[in-house]
Amino acid sequence: DELNPALSTYGLPLGDAFQMRDDVLGAFGDTAITGKPVGDDLREGKPTPLMAIATARANALQLKELQLVGNQDLTPAQIARVQEVIRETGALDELETVITRLTDEAIAAVQHVPFAQSVRDELITLAEYVSWRTV
């Protein structure tokens, strides 16, 4: 019973960090590494924290360019421009900061779980992989 809160304190932020990393990879991932077409999530118009931040911070011209998101026929040039707008708005940097914070929260939670140090080390390794994965 005492493990449930500690493991939840580890797992919940790590799950959020995993999903946010997936959102970044869906918008910026390298096809050769991820196996998914570049900008696939942009073509699909998936509502993600990355797009929410970019949209909230975008100026009028950038908003117009972000309206391309969800168009299945986005060209590589249009995808590159949307990616540029996401970077310009600071959305990518902000999401990276949030991923780091959530990962740090998960790692800190592991320190309080009554497991052998080797198990804690494995959980920390998992957290670091999840947050910085490229696939």
Spans of model-derived segments:
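All-alpha prenyltransferase/terpene-synthase fold signal
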Residues: 1-135
